[in-house]
Regions:
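C-terminal lobe/lid and adjacent interdomain/linker elements of RecA-like ASCE P-loop ATPase modules
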Residues: 2-9, 324-376
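Phosphate-binding glycine-rich loops of NTP-binding sites
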Residues: 33-70, 222, 293-294, 347-350
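Electropositive, glycine-dotted interaction segments
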Residues: 97-244
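Conserved catalytic network of the ASCE P-loop NTPase/AAA+ motor domain
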Residues: 81-84, 299-304, 331-335, 353-355
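Conserved P-loop NTP-binding catalytic core
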Residues: 49-115
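N-terminal pre-Walker A segment at the start of P-loop NTPase domains
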Residues: 4-25
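Conserved ABC ATPase signature
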Residues: 225, 231, 240, 247-251, ...
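Phosphate-binding P-loop
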Residues: 26-32, 301-304
Length: 376
């Protein structure tokens, strides 16, 4: 069989399928360019978000650590009634360019060697395939308990030559990216997804204090480099879009970045000039909601937009008046990134729908199981 090729590193996700993970017994979700996930508390929105995040972390070799932060494998498996057969957590993703990736993990078996790491996942299956429209599917990676076989750059099968970590993805263990270009491209695709959930805005948060800054086209996941990220947008991104968003959100307010050459300690810091206030307010004086909105601005206006950008409950701590400007920014960002938004806010989801014409995906929980509203 000859070599195969797929060229788009930024291909969108066509569908996400999750089974055996917390409240997700068996859920298949088709996705578009802009996806807003809504539903009541406890319906499973965050579980869906986390399942996508698990694939991202698996590509970086951090699957076991990420699951351990959730309590380990026994804590994350579907706890409801099961059919007979192996207990598995399975996540699969298919892309619009014909690429698919499937990862299944489970618990240690009775005859496995004794280990103190009983909360770690054991990878049971891993598979990647590629199918161009109208052509037969080509397997790029197939892993079972006995080992893994990979498609190389000549289109031939190679048995993975190194000992595999049983709790991590093959993708994270590739040592010769030039030899396995398709799998390396898949790994970089998953690693390139971007997730934002918990910006630190407490009194001791780094973003409230001046920070040494470097060129920062991608805001960190906790927002500690906010000042540098905003200055990067000013110098190398949508400067006018940034100024406009700040003015609209804060009734004519003005964003100020104190630069190293303006200070004795050579650090960047955020300030805001607000209507009716006679002096600029420093970051340590700004509200949690104001700082969170500025973090969202930096994420959504990144000069290096990701293929997939996921925001989990972006409305947290925001004043209701900020939801319309936020919705506009999300819709604008969807022109360059596939967006995944989980939200409790009816107002935010309705405003996104008004601006984009995209209806939200509504979840519910029935007998402990997460389902979409149209699920039968």
């Amino acid at each position: 069989m000859g070599a195969v090729s797929f060229t788009s590193m930024s291909s969108s996700i066509a569908a996400l399928t999750v089974s055996g993970y917390r409240s997700l017994r068996d859920l298949a979700l088709p996705l578009g360019q802009l996806n807003v996930i809504t539903g009541p508390n406890g319906c499973g929105k965050s579980n869906l978000y986390r399942s996508l995040f698990l694939l991202h972390r698996a590509a970086d070799g951090l699957l076991a650590r990420t699951l351990s932060e959730e309590g380990g494998m026994p804590s994350v498996l579907w706890a409801g009634a099961r059919k007979k057969g192996p207990v598995r957590l399975q996540i699969a993703v298919s892309f619009t360019d014909g690429l698919t990736y499937h990862l299944a993990c489970g618990l240690p078996e009775v005859n496995d060697l004794p280990s103190s790491f009983k909360l770690d996942p054991l990878i049971k299956e891993e598979k990647a395939t590629f199918s161009e429209r109208g052509s037969q599917s080509v397997t790029l990676l197939e892993r079972a308990k006995s080992g893994a076989s990979l498609r190389d750059n000549n289109g031939g099968w190679v048995h993975f030559p190194l000992a595999l970590s049983r709790s991590e993805s093959v993708l994270s263990q590739l040592a010769e990216p030039h030899r396995y270009p398709h799998l390396s491209a898949l790994r970089e695709r998953l690693r390139g997804w971007r997730f934002y959930h918990a910006f630190r805005t407490d009194e001791q948060a780094p973003l409230r204090q001046p920070q040494v800054g470097v060129f920062t086209p991608v805001l960190s996941d906790n927002g500690h480099d906010l000042a540098a990220a905003l200055q990067t947008i000013i110098e190398a991104g949508d400067t006018e879009g940034l100024w406009r968003a700040v003015r609209q959100a804060f009734d004519g307010g003005e964003l100020l970045i104190t630069l190293p050459q303006d200070t004795s300690d050579g650090r960047f810091s955020v300030q805001m000039r607000l209507p009716g206030v006679l002096r600029p307010l420093h970051a340590w004086e700004l509200s949690d909601g104001t700082l969170r909105f500025l973090c969202l601005l930096a994420a959504l206006l990144s000069p290096r937009p990701p293929a997939v950008l996921a925001l989990n409950e972006p409305e947290t701590s925001l004043h209701p008046d900020l939801l319309s400007p936020l919705a506009a920014l999300i819709v604008q960002a969807s022109a360059q990134s596939q967006m995944w938004i989980t939200t409790h806010s009816v107002r935010l989801s309705e405003e996104i729908q008004r601006l984009s014409g995209v209806s939200p995906i509504t979840l519910r929980k029935t007998d402990g199981e997460t389902r979409t509203l149209y699920h039968k």
